[in-house]
Curated annotation (Swiss-Prot):
Gene Ontology BP annotations: defense response to bacterium; defense response to fungus; killing of cells of another organism
Function: Antibacterial activity against Gram-positive bacterium S.aureus (MIC=40 uM) and Gram-negative bacterium E.coli (MIC=2 uM). Has activity against C.albicans (MIC=46 uM).
Family, similarity comment: Belongs to the frog skin active peptide (FSAP) family. Ranatuerin subfamily.
Protein's cellular compartments: Secreted
Protein name: Ranatuerin-2Cb
Keywords: Amphibian defense peptide, Antibiotic, Antimicrobial, Disulfide bond, Fungicide, Secreted
Tissue and organ distribution: Expressed by the skin glands.
Main location: secreted
Cystine bridges: 20-25
Gene Ontology CC annotations of this record: extracellular region
Length: 27
């Protein structure tokens, strides 16, 4: 559904952010 797809998208962005922080990059 639309809600689940949105949730997956947000989770993906969050995951990318965590990986970025672990790598030591700053937005």
């Amino acid at each position: 559904g639309l809600f689940l797809d949105t949730l997956k998208g947000l989770a993906g962005k969050l995951l990318q952010g965590l990986k970025c922080i672990k790598a030591g990059c700053k937005p």
